[in-house]
Amino acid sequence: MLSRHINYFLAVAEHGSFTRAASALHVSQPALSQQIRQLEESLGVPLFDRSGRTIHLTDAGEVWRQYASRALQELGAGKRAIHDVADLTRGSLRIAVTPTFTSYFIGPLMADFYARYPGITLQLQEMSQEKIEDLLCRDELDVGIAFAPVHLPELEAIPLLTESLALVVAQHHPLAACEQVALSRLHDEKLVLLSAEFATREQIDHYCEKAGLHPQVVIEANSISAVLELIRRTSLSTLLPAAIATQHDGLKAIPLAPPLLERTAVLLRRKNSWQTAAAKAFLHMALEECADVGENESR
């Protein structure tokens, strides 16, 4: 049995069709069907029920699918381990982050990592925490950066920093000279907030409801860069991590009293899985970068 057989089996199981699976795999349907028959013969059981218009996994197929998926993950990890070089002269690293981190944290971190290890190929994606956790468990990512708590027990969360939400305004805003702003002032502020699909917005809404706050949300945006540009050009304000303001000219982060929301940023990785030298180096640099972010916030 070859890894090709496993890969073909999982593709047919996922697509529910030999035709669609063959197209996704870029092989002919007869060749795919032949490989599946060889696999079934080697296992001694039919894996697919072909009696109807659509194909379905048999009971044996359902059971074997779990093991096949894990086997393919382990084979992939083994291949990466073989090519892993301890001196970090080459290798690859697959990273995903939730959106707020692209505005202040991940840029400097990736730049520093590339400067130190130019032979490492980096793949960076921005996505929801739910998707990050799912892809980590499927071994389609090496590391993720998101927030505690973690929802899947297969994952390990390493604390990086505590992120505070602040009132972010332009330098010309009337409140820019304030050292802090009372939470009750949010009733009077006209806000630009991230749209509902962002975890940050969900957390803000939940906290405001719990605290009896009813801020005036006059603009919603599905892009952090759009929010920041609107803040720069208007007298509106927003609620975002305080560290974002330190990375963008013309903005001021004003602490809220009492604090609106604090959350712990974490680096996520799969438990008990092979950690490449690149992944270990990335964790080390992330912790260094977080220490610098903490120092900047305290100034």
Swiss-Prot record:
Pfam family, one: HTH_1
HTH lysR-type domain mapped to chain residues: 1-58
Main location: cytoplasm
Segments of the chain annotated as binding DNA: 18-37
Localization in the cell: Cytoplasm
Residues spanning the signal sequence: none
Single GO MF annotation: DNA-binding transcription factor activity
One term under GO cellular component: cytosol
Sequence similarity: Belongs to the LysR transcriptional regulatory family.
Protein name: HTH-type transcriptional regulator CynR
Natural source organism: Escherichia coli O157:H7
